[in-house]
């Protein structure tokens, strides 16, 4: 086994430089290194490294080289708009690389995640969420007619919503919007919801940009804040974005901008 390993190493050392190219296109080499980098990029996005993948990428690199050479031969690469796109692409690559490098050097810590979690949890303390149902119609008269029918018999709400509501997302469920904090809704819908207690119906229809609403709150409960592990990925991403925003602000303050 040791002898085989030594022979393999010797073969690698003895390989001439041209053998490190996986292909050439009109004399232009496609190197093993560039293929490996391309494969690494694709694998980082979820693909599995395999001979089939490497062959596909190799053919893609050949195709690209064929097109690039044709573009250069025809003078396309020298066109002003193409040069602008190339420069914008170069800038984008550099910006992404800079951000990735900065985040690697300034990673989000567990302490930061915990502090952010506790901060948001404190802000949400005492907040309520509501189980709401509504009937959406186009005009006030229809809304008033429906409201009167519901007031006479709340059991009618389900059927009236199914037959009359213009909200396709909730009509088939009898107007049920499920559980949500009032902030999920537009004003003045949200304001109307917060004024209602469990089982209450609005006194009059509420108008929004969507039309006229007959609103009923079926139930209320305190917002249940998720465990930290459940929201850790979102918190980490939010903190990374904050880190980058602060870095950008720092760079702009240091730059001479006229």
UniProtKB/Swiss-Prot annotation:
The keyword Signal is assigned to this record: yes
Keywords recorded for this protein, A-Z: Isomerase, Rotamase, Signal
Signal peptide: 1-19
Broad EC category: isomerase
Reaction catalysis annotation: [protein]-peptidylproline (omega=180) = [protein]-peptidylproline (omega=0)
Recorded superkingdom: Bacteria
Cystine bridges: none
Residue ranges of domain PpiC in the record: 127-219
UniProt entry tagged with the keyword Ligase: no
EC numbers, comma separated: 5.2.1.8
Similarity comment text for this entry: Belongs to the PpiC/parvulin rotamase family.
Protein name (database record): Probable parvulin-type peptidyl-prolyl cis-trans isomerase
